[in-house]
Amino acid sequence: MKRILIALAVLLAVQVADAQTKSPEAAKKAVESAEAASKDAKKATKVATWLKLASSYMDAYNAPAGSAWLGASKQELQLIMGNDRPVSVEEVVLGTDQLIKETYSNKEFYFSPAGQLVLINVTQPVVEDALGGALEAYKKAYEVDVKQSK
């Protein structure tokens, strides 16, 4: 029984480590690497190159938000964000809703009066128009994949 619990703990630890979000710096480096590969004449003919580029753009789009998710409480976010503290905190009104806005160096979090995250606004994206870049990479992957295998 003890071995099974240890094996499950190791498996869970590996999955949690794999699920870590990329830092903005790592995401930018991954996009630059994938873009360089897509410009290589030999690699540009492979579907995997374009899928990797699209995936890198998607990671870059999601990187500034970090591990935050909508519906998270302030306490949960403080736990997962570590030393990342807001630069300023203020009360704002969006539409008819009274919200608490926490401003960070590259994003803004908006919390409901109950303390739940309801909106994430990225103020400094890792890559400009990351979603557009991902869409173009997916289109190119479709064009390159003449057998429609992927």
Kindly give the residue locations of the regions a language model identified.
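Sec-dependent N-terminal signal peptides
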Residues: 4-13
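Short coil/linker segments at helix-helix boundaries
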Residues: 56-150
